[in-house]
Structure formats: structure tokens, C-alpha cells
Amino acid sequence: MISAMKLPLLATTIAGSLPKPTWLAEPEKLWAPWKLEGRALDDGKRDAVRLVLAMQEKAGIDIVSDGEQTRRHFVNGYMERLEGIDFKNLKTVRIRNRYDANVPRVVGPVSRPAPVHSEDVKFLRSATDRAIKFTLPGPMTMVDTLYDEHYGSREKLAMAFAAILNQEARELAALGVDTIQFDEPAFNVYFDEVRDWGVAALERAREGLACKTAVHICYGYGIEANIVWKKSLGNEWRQYEQTFPLLARSSIDQVSLECANSRVPIELIGLLEGKDVLVGAIDVATTRVESAEDVARVIRAALKHVPKERLFPCTNCGMVPLARDVAAGKLAALGAGAALVRRELV
């Protein structure tokens, strides 16, 4: 682990996924099947990680990740390695309380027969000398991405997942991960559950971790269902107002959120007193590539509510649905925009 390394002021990072090479999976598509098999697939995934690391380093990203190149999906890529979940006989259910999806079924006690991402992290750690971040799905979002036929309680299932995630996270931290992020888009939808057991499940997942821990809560990928949903939310998006006070009292170190080109009142980030704030300064729902000044504008606004030492410019969400050149341009803007404000502060 190199978390003790000196990071610059306004250290940049990304929220999640990056586009996959066209030879690995169909581009600009969620859940795209692999184009390779066996050893060729293993090699292809590692080559893809090398590419996205180079993309991030060229853009000046300070805390890098594997861009989720080894997984087809940020939730199912983990759950498909667990026992007790049937991926063959799917069930159509409403997820995130806004669109229908064919999801796997929980048919027995969930368990993790073997580490899921240890080999991925070993390679990632060996491939860069920068601080690294690794993402895992959060317990509530896992529960919301399947159909339960065994536990009969979303809370009980979430706690079972949290225990599994904690085992995984401890192993990844020991392998040198500097930040482990739990992705919880479901926190922006099920506010009563967040209060009643969602934060508790998140706390269980991060229990005993020595590395930095983060939670990512956003308004989703730039897909049609999310775009339509966001249009229904009115002139101000105040969902964070219900979750941020709870997270401010939690043991989670960092909160990653959506700000760029959104209707989130920027002052809501002030509710995260004492936490690092990963402010989304890149809009992932458009192919327009931001300028450095666009990014700098978001950062300057955020600095009115968060101390500079606690602000980390980031992307709003993952970018796997975007073309690689668009994603590369956006990363470059993120790095340049942070550098611009950094110079203004010294």
C-alpha cells in the first residue's frame, strides 16, 4: 500500500468504469459480452487495464483504477462469482425503482467460495506506481439488482452481502489498494432503507479496513432510463439532503457524488462535514468534452463548501457507455481543470 505517498492538493480520481477496447467487448454498451475466451480473455483484460492506466496517467489522474476492465458490469461482475445466486433462470423486476431488468435470483444462502478480485488487484498494483482505487458494489445496490427467493428480507440479504464484501475488501487492502469504494446508487432512491439499515450494511462492509473507504452515490450512467428519471426530479435535486447527514456520522472516509451539469444544489456538500468529498466535475451523460475551465468552475464552487484539503475532483459516474476518445478527452479535462485551480490556490 502506498497511501502514505504525498498526493497533490485537489488530487483527481474517477468514479468507476472506463470504456473497454473494441477487441475486448462491444463498445459503448452496458453488459457487453466478452469477445475473447479462456487465456486470451485473461490476457485481453490485462492489456485493457494497461490501456486505461496509460489513459489516466496521461491525463494527470492522481488516484487511478482499473476502470472495471475485468468485469462486464459493476454489480453482476461481482455477484456472478458468488454461490447461492442463479444467473441462468432470470427474473424481470424493477430496479432502482425506475426501470425493469432481467436479474439473477437468490436461491440459497449467499457465500463467496474464493476471492473474486485478488488477482485483478495484484496486477493493478504491479502495473502502476500511483495510488490505486478499487470499486466494489455496495450491499444495498446488490440487493436491488436481483430477485430474492431465499432470505425474505432485503435487510438480511444486505447484511449477508456486507459480510462477504468485508472479507473481499480486507484482502484487497492487504494487497495494496489505497482506497476501496462501495458503489451505492440505490442510496439515491430508497431513503427509508438507507436510514433503517443501508448505512449499517455499508459500515459492516468497511469494518476493520485500514485503507481509505469511499461510497459513490450518483444519478446513474448516461442511459435513457436515467435521463428520463432525472427529468422528472424537478428544478432541484435534493436527494443527497436525506443521505449526507447519515454518512457524515458514519465511519466512511469519502463520499463520491454527482455535481457537473446537474441540478444538485452545490451547498448540499456542506452536509458532509469532516468527510473527503469526491466532487463530480465531469458529466458522463453527454458526449461533449468539457474544457479545463468547465471543470475548474465546478471545483471553485465546491471549494466554497469544502476545505481544499478534503476536495477530490472526480467524474460524476462511470464512463463505459462512452466512446474511448470521448472518455480520454474528459479525463484530460479533469486533470487540467484540477491543475488550473491548484495553481490558483498556491
Where are these regions (language model features)?
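Domain-level signal for soluble alpha/beta catalytic cores
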Residues: 1-346
